[in-house]
């Protein structure tokens, strides 16, 4: 990660190769490999890795999805992204919720399939519905249309920026960024993102996103 941050793709790939030989490959190395492919302009490979991470490792959606969106924007292939997200969200409601949450906290806008996931997130989050005074009656879903979804997204994004987004499953240490080594319990890759935006003392957290 240090190597790729310094723009040394070859050195980063060398470390990844060493990890393969030692059989210590982790999802962390997958993320680094995807970044290397992106910097090397091997966009097809980078997209494949990010898609695999999203499909197989729900807790890293918060890291992989923004990068995937950025790639498709660069390549002007947002329709391909829309098709991919639609297939995922239709086949897995929990994954759709996790995608919606990721879209909110990363302030991703103007992509129809992701907007649908955000709407689904709002409609199916019981705590958020209670906060917005929306009942479980499906007819009351129409109330969401009278509330600016964009305004809700902006408010939740601002709130997410000021609260912890990740928590260690081992000791409970919380942080804004994904930390591979927990500074509290010294365990590797034990942090997971929360699956909803924190409302401080007004609302409570729901469980972490995990595999």
Where do the language-model regions lie?
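Amphipathic alpha-helical elements of HEAT/ARM-like alpha-solenoid repeat scaffolds that form extended
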Residues: 65-69, 98-105, 130-136
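Cys/His-clustered metal-coordination modules, chiefly Zn-binding fingers
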Residues: 122-211
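Alpha-helical repeat scaffolds
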Residues: 9-20, 43-55, 77-92, 110-125, ...
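Non-catalytic protein-protein interaction scaffold segments in large eukaryotic complex-forming proteins
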Residues: 57, 65, 71-75
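Residue at a conserved register position within TPR or TPR-like alpha-solenoid repeats
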Residues: 3, 37, 71-72, 104-108, ...
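Start-of-helix register in tetratricopeptide repeats
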Residues: 1, 11, 27-28, 62-63, ...
């Amino acid at each position: 990660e240090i190597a790729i941050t310094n723009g040394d793709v070859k050195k980063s790939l060398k470390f990844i190769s060493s990890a393969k030989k030692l059989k210590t490959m982790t999802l962390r190395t997958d993320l680094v490999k995807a970044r290397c492919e992106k910097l090397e302009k091997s966009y097809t490979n980078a997209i494949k890795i990010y898609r695999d991470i999203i499909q197989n490792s729900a807790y890293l959606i918060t890291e992989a999805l923004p990068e995937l969106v950025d790639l498709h924007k660069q390549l002007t292939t947002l329709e391909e992204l829309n098709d991919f997200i639609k297939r995922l969200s239709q086949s897995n409601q929990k994954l759709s919720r996790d995608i919606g949450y990721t879209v909110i906290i990363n302030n991703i806008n103007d992509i129809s399939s992701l907007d649908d996931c955000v709407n689904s997130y709002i409609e199916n989050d019981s705590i958020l519905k209670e906060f917005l005074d929306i009942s479980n009656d499906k007819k009351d879903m129409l109330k969401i249309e009278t509330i600016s979804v964009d305004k809700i997204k902006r408010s939740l994004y601002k709130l997410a920026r000021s609260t912890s987004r990740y928590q260690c499953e081992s000791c409970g240490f919380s942080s804004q960024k994904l930390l591979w080594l927990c500074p509290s319990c010294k365990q590797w890759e034990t942090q997971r993102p929360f699956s909803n935006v924190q409302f401080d003392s007004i609302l409570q957290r729901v469980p972490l996103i995990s595999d």
